[in-house]
Every structure is written in structure tokens, then in C-alpha cells.
Regions:
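Secondary-structure capping and boundary motifs in well-ordered enzyme cores
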Residues: 29-32, 52-59, 97-101, 267, ...
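N-terminal core-binding DNA-recognition domain of tyrosine recombinases/integrases
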Residues: 48, 71, 112-113
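Helix-centered, glycine/charged polyanion-binding patches within enzymatic domains
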Residues: 7-10, 215-216, 221-301
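Amphipathic, well-packed alpha-helical segments that form the structural scaffold of globular domains
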Residues: 37-45, 126, 279, 283
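Polybasic low-complexity intrinsically disordered regions
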Residues: 1-6, 57, 75, 79-82, ...
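Alpha-helical support elements that line or immediately flank enzyme active sites
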Residues: 59-71
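An N-terminal domain-cap segment
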Residues: 39-58
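Charged, often Cys/His-bearing segments associated with DNA-binding zinc-finger transcription factors
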Residues: 1-34, 38, 321-328
Length: 328
């Protein structure tokens, strides 16, 4: 059981809850802890051997999730646990002597990567949400976003990561990775994620972002011509709602036809807006703006984890037990 220090105990109950405390208490209730722990438990070292006992699996998983929510590196996570009682309480850490060091935190992430935990976590979260009535429906929206990578790294030769690439968007060059997602057009939940180098065209990944039961596929004008591609021919019959390129709109001369076309484009755009929400959560709320690791595999694992957590975060209000308003 967790012991509270006098300082912790004094702080509790008297003051206003901080945003961090409110967020973590909500996450405490909506994360499917039992299912996630069951995925890792078979691979986690068990206590009972001589020497130092491993940290509780629940503590290590909680620390791993805290790193995603607050964009903390391993050393920054260790420091934050020393400095912030709220994070210690969430991680179920008793005293300051029980805080895992940065190497232990790193090794736990390596263990998760080795066993492909991130992809299974996204599946487990979505299965959990489906049981709560947030299931995938008949349409998928596809989109991609750029995640910048550092243009030099701290390795010996200061070279750029060979698995990242440069791409041009507008008049700017970006170096890094691209995250492609498939999102349910009713619930807004992310169900498929692919990460590639930044110079890979969005359209080439679209076929990997479908769950296979959808009737409609929406995307921006970067997906123009998707229905003609060979890899889509093998998919079930889909209704494609792809945005027109602005240059196409300029070619419409008939005023009535132009008005109708603009209205139709607006309708498609308002449907596509759902795909922006998960990107906003991971970038703005979780602060994920830069690639953290070297190579695509490690970064893909992090992005999968972030989208599993953004799904929970976006649906937390529906998942939280309705608290009866107290009549004072």
C-alpha cells in the first residue's frame, strides 16, 4: 500500500485540484488497466529471485503512460517523479527511494517494443471502447501528418537518422516522419496507424488504414485518384468522398454548378474534420511535436501508444461514470 508523506497528506483535501490532478484521476478511471497489464505480464520478470526485486508492473506501465501524456524523456521522467507528488501517487510509488531510475524506465520501454505491445494496446483500447458502445461504424477517414525529426543527432557522427527523409510542403522543407491514420467517421476513433518517412506520398498508405468493413472512404485532395490504384481494386466496393483539388474548382464556369460543387465540398470537409481531432490531441495536448527516438520502429511504437491514449482521452467524458450533481 502507498504511504503518504506528511506533506502529501497536508496538501490533499484542502486546496483546489490542479488540471493535472483532474486529468490523471480521469485517466485512472478510463484506462483498461487489467487488459493492458495482462498483455505485458507474461513477459515481465517475476519477483522471487535473489537480489533486487523488479518494480511492480503496474508502476512501470503507469510511468510509461505518464511519459506519453507529458512528453517526458527517460531522465526527465525520473526527475519529474522526484519533484511532483501527483505523478508519484499516480504511478503508485510509495516513497522517494522507490522511484525507478532512467535506465529502468528505458529497459521497460525496450521490453514493450520487443513484444510489439503498442499495436496490441491500440487493439485492446478499441476493443474496450467497443464494449462501452464506442464501436467502429461504416466509414473511414484517412489522413497524414508530419512529425519533425532533429536534423542532427547526438550520435558519434552527428548524422541525420537514415530512416527519416525530407519532404516539401508549401514552400517549406520538413525532415522527419509521417504518421498516417484511419479514423472512424462517426466516433472519431483511430483504428489504424502507419508510420513512414516524410517523403512517402499519403495515397500509397491508404489501403493499410482500412478495417475492411467500411462502405465509405473520405480523404483530402492528396488522395485524388485513390479508387484507380491497383491495391484498392482488391478491396470491397467503397464510396469515395475525396476532396476536389482547388484547381479543379476553378475550372467550373457554370454559377449554379459551382455553388452546388462548393456545397458538396463543404459537406465532405465537415465530415473529414473528425480526423483532425486525434492529431490535435497528440500534438497540442500531449505535446508530441518531434520524433523522440532513432529509426521508424521505435517511433512507430510511440505513435501507436499515443493514438491509443488519444482515443481514451477523447472518449473519457462518455466513459466516466456520471457523477450525480450534489444539491447544496
Amino acid at each position: 500500500s502507498m504511504q503518504l508523506t506528511f506533506g502529501d497528506a497536508e496538501g490533499l483535501g484542502k486546496r483546489k485540484q490542479t488540471r493535472r490532478e483532474i486529468f490523471l484521476s480521469e485517466m485512472e478511471k478510463v484506462v483498461p488497466w487489467k487488459q493492458l497489464l495482462a498483455l505485458i505480464a507474461p513477459h515481465y520478470p517475476v519477483s522471487g529471485r535473489p537480489g533486487r526485486q523488479p518494480y511492480a508492473l503496474a508502476t512501470m506501465l503507469r510511468i510509461h503512460l505518464l511519459q506519453q501524456w507529458y512528453a517526458l524523456s527517460d531522465p526527465a521522467m525520473e526527475e519529474a517523479l522526484h519533484e511532483i507528488p501527483t505523478l508519484r501517487r499516480f504511478a503508485q510509488i510509495g516513497g522517494l527511494d522507490d522511484i525507478p531510475d532512467e535506465t529502468t524506465i528505458l529497459n521497460f520501454r525496450r521490453l514493450l517494443e520487443t513484444h510489439g505491445f503498442a499495436a496490441r494496446m491500440l487493439e485492446a483500447v478499441n476493443a474496450h471502447l467497443a464494449r462501452k458502445g464506442q464501436s467502429l461504424r461504416s466509414g473511414t477517414i484517412v489522413d497524414a501528418t508530419l512529425i519533425a525529426a532533429p536534423s542532427s543527432t547526438k550520435n558519434a557522427d552527428h548524422a541525420r537518422d537514415p530512416e527519416m527523409h525530407q519532404t516539401k510542403k508549401g514552400n517549406q522543407y520538413y525532415f522527419g516522419m509521417k504518421a498516417h491514420i484511419g479514423v472512424d467517421d462517426v466516433s472519431g476513433l483511430v483504428h489504424h496507424v502507419e508510420c513512414t518517412a516524410a517523403n512517402v506520398a499519403d495515397i500509397t498508405q491508404a489501403h493499410k488504414l482500412l478495417h475492411g468493413k467500411e462502405d465509405t472512404l473520405s480523404g483530402d485532395s492528396g488522395y485524388t485518384g485513390l479508387e484507380k490504384r491497383a491495391e484498392m481494386a482488391r478491396k470491397r466496393k467503397l464510396r469515395y468522398l475525396i476532396a476536389e483539388k482547388p484547381s479543379k474548382l476553378k475550372q467550373v464556369k457554370n454559377a449554379r454548378e459551382l455553388q452546388w460543387t462548393k456545397r458538396w465540398e463543404h459537406a465532405k470537409a465537415s465530415l473529414r474534420a473528425k480526423v483532425e481531432h486525434p492529431f490535435r490531441v497528440i500534438k497540442r495536448q500531449f505535446g508530441y511535436v518531434k520524433v523522440r527516438y532513432r529509426g521508424l520502429a521505435k517511433n512507430t511504437a510511440q505513435v501507436l501508444t499515443l493514438f491509443a491514449l488519444s482515443n481514451l482521452c477523447m472518449k473519457r467524458k462518455q466513459l466516466l461514470p456520471v457523477v450525480a450533481e450534489m444539491c447544496l
